[in-house]
Amino acid sequence: MRRIKKGDQVIVIAGKDKGKKGLVLSVLSGDKLVVEGVNLVRKHQRPNPMRGVTGGIVEKAMPIHSSNVALFNAAINKGDRVGFRLLADGRKVRFYRSTNELIDA
């Protein structure tokens, strides 16, 4: 089970976008994440009429390493560490370390 999953709200804790919040759009292999509105780069795109792509300069979210983000805990309005716990029914769930609140209830 991963500490950060697709759809989680995260906050960037290191790098040029430190302090920005966003949703995880995808989790890539090698501990990389694509986060909405974070690590944006400008790419020059060639027009391709066969695919219906117009040319120009587009902004694209590039991957960021998972060690540079923390799961955002709305209860304390900060990034928080994630722990794992086994429930009585045998399910493995994530929880916030500071508040002991379950994430995957």
Swiss-Prot record:
Q: Which InterPro entries match?
A: KOW, Rib_uL2_dom2, Ribosomal_uL24, Ribosomal_uL24_CS, Ribosomal_uL24_KOW, Translation_prot_SH3-like_sf
The cross-references to Gene3D superfamilies, in alphabetical order and at most eight, read: 2.30.30.30
Asked whether the UniProt record includes Glycosyltransferase among its keywords, one would answer no
> SUPFAM superfamilies, from UniProt?
Translation proteins SH3-like domain
Q: Which GO terms describe its biological process?
A: translation
| UniProtKB keywords | Ribonucleoprotein, Ribosomal protein, RNA-binding, rRNA-binding
Return the GO cellular component terms, semicolon-separated. ribonucleoprotein complex; ribosome
Going by the entry's taxonomy, the superkingdom of the source organism is recorded as Bacteria
The entry lists its GO molecular-function terms as:
rRNA binding; structural constituent of ribosome
What does this gene product do? One of two assembly initiator proteins, it binds directly to the 5'-end of the 23S rRNA, where it nucleates assembly of the 50S subunit. One of the proteins that surrounds the polypeptide exit tunnel on the outside of the subunit.
Family per record: Belongs to the universal ribosomal protein uL24 family.
Q: Which PANTHER family match?
A: MITOCHONDRIAL RIBOSOMAL PROTEIN L24
What is known about its subunit structure?
A: Part of the 50S ribosomal subunit.
Name-wise, this protein is: Large ribosomal subunit protein uL24
Protein species of origin: Methylococcus capsulatus (strain ATCC 33009 / NCIMB 11132 / Bath)
